Amino acid sequence: MELLHLLLFSWALSAHLFLALAQRSTYIVHLDKSLMPNVFTDHHHWHSSTIDSIKASVPSSVDRFHSAPKLVYSYDNVLHGFSAVLSKDELAALKKLPGFISAYKDRTVEPHTTHTSDFLKLNPSSGLWPASGLGQDVIVAVLDSGIWPESASFQDDGMPEIPKRWKGICKPGTQFNASMCNRKLIGANYFNKGILANDPTVNITMNSARDTDGHGTHCASITAGNFAKGVSHFGYAPGTARGVAPRARLAVYKFSFNEGTFTSDLIAAMDQAVADGVDMISISYGYRFIPLYEDAISIASFGAMMKGVLVSASAGNRGPGIGSLNNGSPWILCVASGHTDRTFAGTLTLGNGLKIRGWSLFPARAFVRDSPVIYNKTLSDCSSEELLSQVENPENTIVICDDNGDFSDQMRIITRARLKAAIFISEDPGVFRSATFPNPGVVVNKKEGKQVINYVKNSVTPTATITFQETYLDTKPAPVVAASSARGPSRSYLGISKPDILAPGVLILAAYPPNVFATSIGTNILLSTDYILESGTSMAAPHAAGIAAMLKAAHPEWSPSAIRSAMMTTADPLDNTRKPIKDSDNNKAATPLDMGAGHVDPNRALDPGLVYDATPQDYVNLLCSLNFTEEQFKTIARSSASHNCSNPSADLNYPSFIALYSIEGNFTLLEQKFKRTVTNVGKGAATYKAKLKAPKNSTISVSPQILVFKNKNEKQSYTLTIRYIGDEGQSRNVGSITWVEQNGNHSVRSPIVTSPIIEVW
């Protein structure tokens, strides 16, 4: 019997080890193309032959899904390599083959979930819109969850013929045929082999570029949607919706499906976009914190930059914690999210005649007129459905809810209690980003809440009337940084201040699939519509992409770095009260680690005067300085053989400055020098003088203090020195250097921030 137990145990152990070795995963594999043997006709031939050689050299094994290694995608534009399903033994064999650089497991990617053209001061008579022809013939790629092609935002009224340089396709699939593309939506493709490699039993319910989520449709219409008249979000924000670049061409690459969102599919989408000839890429997805050399968005964006394509990416919605930012690589345009000057309201009229404009997005014309209002400390915590159920005549009663710090839970409980309406007292900035408001009611601030409570306490029969579906413009202050917008510095590389720019991202009206539920009334009435309000840096990134696209149309010779520089150095750090832009998290002045250089100003970006340009070699020099292993360097840069590392430099020619200091004893000590080179993109000769604003407890100096340009496209360099001395209690401090044109109109501003490194890690 003991022998039998021993044999059974040995068999079980062997089976367990076999399954562990045989278990396959999808890997992203980076190869050095310079080492591709001459026998292969192209990269795909090399990749498929590599997998075939693995099959021949490694004993066959079967896991739950796969009986052999399998090639998923071949990549050659934004990176060189492939994705493949491999066991650990097969991966080990692959590592021994010529050209192998690195490999890491496929991972999931997360989404970072109108009036804004007016707020951005875009107009048809002057500035960036007419100068760029509204972005005409620039091709913007939106990598997301697909598109709803029937939307009015994607009709091609007024669009000329498709540019001949376009190489992409309109790929047919489920509920999507090639005729659904047009002169606006010139391309639609989809990528889901990574999902199927992860689990071949999955049934892709919408195997096409059609959007069943809404995120992609919304983002695409923000960046380049055509003019769509007479739209609104259930009566809020009524008017004409239009994208930032309404005459730009859209190419949609769906890599995010209901069944999953994988890195291998994302890379394939970006690789194809660059091959198709797009000018700009907008992506509103990111990862949790991972190293730069495993961040596929950063790696693929580096490859896109090398081919002259700028990537605009969302900073993420994990704010307001310091260092919470995604997509902060030096070659990416990283976009933060801000509130605009538009607010949505319901007017609260008390029985004594006092009118208060409360915040509301209740999606219907509810009839709340002269209804009784009640308030008591226990009930008005609004945290107990049981207590609220004891309210007499709830269908005709308005309850006041105190601020208990959990508005969403209060709204859920109020809705389930089926009360007539509620008056919520809250100053939580998160409340004013959500478009979900299923129960009649308004949100008022604490001061207004006291007025309402005093009225109720001092009235025998207190009543109130609430009207809904109201939209107001020119709210002050605006813009304001959204509390959820992720903050820098970037964990990818601390030496550059990120994010780069602030763009509209809170309650943005844009297109949406009409068969996807958008909001609700009560607990069981689900509503859908063609246009909805959404919030997040996901909405900010396509705004920036649309502006960048128009700058590319107006200045086709500008590099990705020049476009980003123009947007940053002309950004406005002040709000519409001409005071520093505030952070809605703490109501204090925002820093460059919250909002970048400031709020994007498209018309000023058209004519920035000077730009901080950077070549692909400049980014390579930066990578050379980061003490990466050869494997890590080549994973990003593809091949060390094709790059020169003789001049490594961590000081990239960037239009912002960050100095991170360490704490030594009771004092912080810092002295850091930066070298910058600016290019004159004005009309001709010009002279600029430096205007300095030092961060608190700092001195800054610049040499030379005057830059003289004799010709357009001439370059001049300067050195900025920051010296900081302070006690350990000091935190982030802000300054700036502005090059002011003498006898001219240009003002070229770069933010400066000093911050203790201990706050990041």
From Swiss-Prot:
Regulation acting on activity, per entry: Inhibited by 1 mM 4-(2-aminoethyl)-benzenesulfonyl fluoride (AEBSF), a general inhibitor of serine proteinases, but not by the more selective serine protease inhibitors N-alpha-tosyl-L-lysinyl-chloromethylketone (TLCK), N-tosyl-L-phenylalaninyl-chloromethylketone (TPCK), leupeptin, aprotinin or benzamidine. Its proteolytic activity is autoinhibited by the non-covalent binding of the propeptide to the catalytic domain. No effect on activity by the addition of CaCl(2) or calcium chelators.
Region (Necessary for prodomain cleavage and secretion): 756-761
Location in the cell: Secreted
Annotated region described as Disordered, given as residue ranges: 574-598
Post-translational modification: Propeptide is internally cleaved at Asn-38 and Asp-52 in a pH-dependent manner leading to the dissociation of the propeptide from the catalytic domain and resulting in the release of the active subtilase. Cleavage occurs at pH 5.7 and to a stronger extent at pH 5.2.
Gene Ontology BP terms: defense response; peptide catabolic process; plant-type cell wall modification; positive regulation of defense response to insect; positive regulation of gene expression; proteolysis; regulation of cell wall pectin metabolic process; response to wounding
pH dependence: Optimum pH is 7.5-8.0. 60% of the activity is retained at pH 11.0. No autolysis at pH 4.0-9.0 in the presence of 5 mM EDTA or 5 mM CaCl(2).
Glycan-linked positions: 177, 203, 376, 697, 745
Site (Cleavage): residue numbering on this chain: 38-39, 52-53
Composition-biased stretches (Basic and acidic residues): 575-586
Induction: Expressed in response to mechanical wounding and insect herbivory in leaves. Not expressed in uninjured leaves.
Deleted gene: phenotype: RNAi-mediated knockdown results in partial loss of resistance against M.sexta larvae, impaired systemic induction of late wound response genes and in reduced levels of cell wall homogalacturonan (HG) and pectin methylesterification (DM).
Disulfide pairings: 170-181, 382-401, 624-645
Primary location group: secreted
A Pfam match: fn3_6
Temperature dependence of activity: Thermostable. Activity is unaffected by heating to 60 degrees Celsius and only partially reduced after incubation at 70 degrees Celsius.
Segments forming domain Peptidase S8: 116-606
The record's note on its domains: The mature polypeptide has three domains: The catalytic domain, an interposed protease-associated (PA) domain required for homodimerization and a C-terminal seven-stranded jelly-roll fibronectin (Fn) III-like domain.
Quaternary structure note: Homodimer.
PANTHER family to which the protein is assigned, alphabetical: PROPROTEIN CONVERTASE SUBTILISIN/KEXIN
Function field: Serine protease. Has preference for Gln in the P1 position and Lys in the P2 position of oligopeptide substrates. Active also with His in the P1 position. Involved in resistance against insects partly by regulating expression of systemic wound response genes and possibly by its post-ingestive activity in the insect gut. Apart from the role in defense, may be involved in regulation of pectin methylesterases (PMEs) activity and pectin methylesterification of the cell wall.
Protein name: Subtilisin-like protease SBT3
Provenance organism: Solanum lycopersicum
